[in-house]
């Protein structure tokens, strides 16, 4: 079943806005709350974004598998822009390690979403 633009895109756009907001903070989240490791935060943020972007791009169920790569690429580009954005925020830096963690999250989110769709397609068959 196809869903409308107004139902598919807002979650991804809101999540991207939340990432931007967190990246705009002078002190990283991990420094405020040591119990939440920064490493896991990066992976989680971008895993969720990749899954939400895949959901947004996959309006037609017959084309869902073809939207995994574009969702990953869009997430990777957003992660790169997020790292560049952090260069201009006081007390923040951009590092290749953080970008790598963002990409790991994007890969994880895309993979889990693809696995989920395959599993549910097989159950329907």
Q: What are the roles of these predicted feature ranges?
A:
Residues 120-125:
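Short, charged juxtamembrane terminal tails flanking transmembrane helices
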